Amino acid sequence: MIAGHHMDTIRSVTRIRLRSVEEPLDRPAAAWEAVRFLSTAEALGLLPASPESIETLDVRTVRAVLKEAAAAGVARQALAEADSRDERDADAWVDVLVHANVALADCPIPDRTWPGLADLLGIDLLAKLVGVAPASARRYLAGDRATPDAVAARLHWIALIAGDLAGSYNEFGIRRWFSRARSQLDGKAPADVLAGEWSPDDQGPRAVRTLATRLLDAAAT
């Protein structure tokens, strides 16, 4: 369960290794939105630079990530809301985090997202998933070439999926998840559905995201 002052480790990917939760984020709805926010922010490359793992779900941590997101031009309104509300109010934090999660889901930031996803998935798999040659992916990663809008949208969608999967899998498991056939995808692997010049609005990619989101829902209960 997410709720409560103590929790089993629910994430093992990179820096987020949550073991406890503090008020007011110990309310189930607040904890759920906060975990989702941190998961997505990490996948998008929005965690503040630090060598330390994040082991406690608390207001200080969430506020720091909100500031990092706002500095990247994302979720500025959510940060303003956080600054204007009583930070001891769990319901207020639910509102702030719902708005922050919507903002993260709607705002591709490829320059921040390429490095973390390349480390997580490997450049070859990531290039395949976003529909570009590995050489092109390396140029986008290095900043030698601007990421085209269509590629940025696909990269963002992969990051959202990876954030959802991080509630259930480690790095190896996430990479393997993309390659395993799924009955919910008519026997195809997610990597087969996410092939070529797809769009996040297409039915197949949306089905892949739904499949990943169900795993995040399960990890939160």
List the predicted regions and their residue ranges.
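Non-transmembrane "mature" sequence context
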Residues: 1-221
